[in-house]
Amino acid sequence: MALWGGRFQGETSALFKLFNDSLPVDYRLFEQDVVGSIAWADAIASVGIITATECSDLKKALNELLVEVKGDPAIILASGAEDIHSFVESALIAKVGDLGKKLHTGRSRNDQVATDLKLWCQSEGAALVARLQTLRSELIALAEREFDAVMPGYTHLQRAQPVTFGHWCLAYVEMIERDLSRLTDALKRANTCPLGSGALAGTAYQMDRHALAAALNFASPTLNSLDSVSDRDHVVELCSTASISMMHLSRMAEDLIFFNSGEAGFISLSDEVTSGSSLMPQKKNPDALELIRGKTGRVYGSLVGILTTMKALPLAYNKDMQEDKEGLFDVVDSWAICLDMAALVLSGLVVNRPNALLAAQQGYANATELADYLVSKGMPFREAHHVVGVAVVAAIAKKIPLEGFTLAEFKTFADIIEDDVYPNLTIEACLAKRDVLGGTALAQVKQAIAAKNAG
């Protein structure tokens, strides 16, 4: 039986029921709905709506239901209930009779679902924090293993300057740490309890909402009933945080896909995160990384979806808000599996050091060092930049690296060049000169890894 049937005389259309029912989506809020109902039983007992014995009986039945559903989750969807709240109430009434009909006193599905959803976000958010921390640890471990592996750094996807693989790993550690910070902040803002807000104006029973919030492990109750039942900022923020994090994961995946390609060959991926071709037996495809990149779009889509759903809703609750969950659940599921998969990819990744080093030695990645050398001899940087550009053109024509010029040839570009230019053009020199906070010098990378491990 619907929770709202008394107002209606005609039968509900089967098509409308299919369209209106949300149980196929919100069944995932079962545990939160039961936990919230247990807290609500205590709250209405505290204001004399039910006796202590009735409260105990309700809580006992709710806990039994929790155990039963955990043993056989299929019974939720098999019930045909309108939503998860209807399922719990119907199951409760089946256990304790008319006493079960008292539980909803003073409560609306509006504050009930808002509470369930915040509880779910807190629980899933904590698991996501742990996943982000695991990925951070894998990046740091990989940075330690390959801290001194040299490879080209890129701008515009062209070889720019040599960097270390450890430095590359630490760049993504910074991004993951910002993701952690954003998620932690979002969960802090979501840590308020809407229960007791009623449909929109507040419950008519003078219960202690601070105690109710504490019983559900919220930091505090919400402060405005209209906002409480119509707020979905926590959904938007979680989807937004996930979108930014997925953008970082997608960028990392793109880097690794390129590094793994035959054109680069800087890394090798484990067999456990790659697949083959049904036609071409030689193929070893980076499918895990490509799926991370691909799933980013669906996460973005869910963020845009909830923003669009909420953008023109008047206060307070509107049925449009039933559409908040499907996208959120998909975002959390997608983000979680991508974090797990990224960590797995990194755990088995090996750098092909000779290939990476050879690539770093090509492409005139030491051109900036030659310009800096000229500056050290007194030449203004803009002039040095021009001189080195001319030298690079000449080197390309001769098919030699910059250090392949004889001293006499170097002097045709700038007479101030001496024999001491050659030590400045080695890969080792290029790296060592970046010995500044945040730089790619080995000493800086070691210090950064140590700091991350300490943190």
From Swiss-Prot:
One of its GO terms (cellular component) is cytosol. One of its GO terms (biological process) is L-arginine biosynthetic process. Coiled coil: none annotated. It is found in: Cytoplasm. It comes from the Bacteria. Its EC number is 4.3.2.1. SUPFAM superfamilies: L-aspartase-like. Keywords: Amino-acid biosynthesis, Arginine biosynthesis, Cytoplasm, Lyase. It is an enzyme of class 4 (lyase). It catalyses: 2-(N(omega)-L-arginino)succinate = fumarate + L-arginine. Pathway: Amino-acid biosynthesis; L-arginine biosynthesis; L-arginine from L-ornithine and carbamoyl phosphate: step 3/3. GO terms for molecular function: argininosuccinate lyase activity. Gene3D superfamilies: Fumarase/aspartase (C-terminal domain), Fumarase/aspartase (Central domain), Fumarase/aspartase (N-terminal domain). InterPro entries: Arg_succ_lyase_C, Argininosuccinate_lyase, Fumarase/histidase_N, Fumarate_lyase_CS, Fumarate_lyase_fam, Fumarate_lyase_N, L-Aspartase-like. Belongs to the lyase 1 family. Argininosuccinate lyase subfamily. This is Argininosuccinate lyase. The gene is argH.
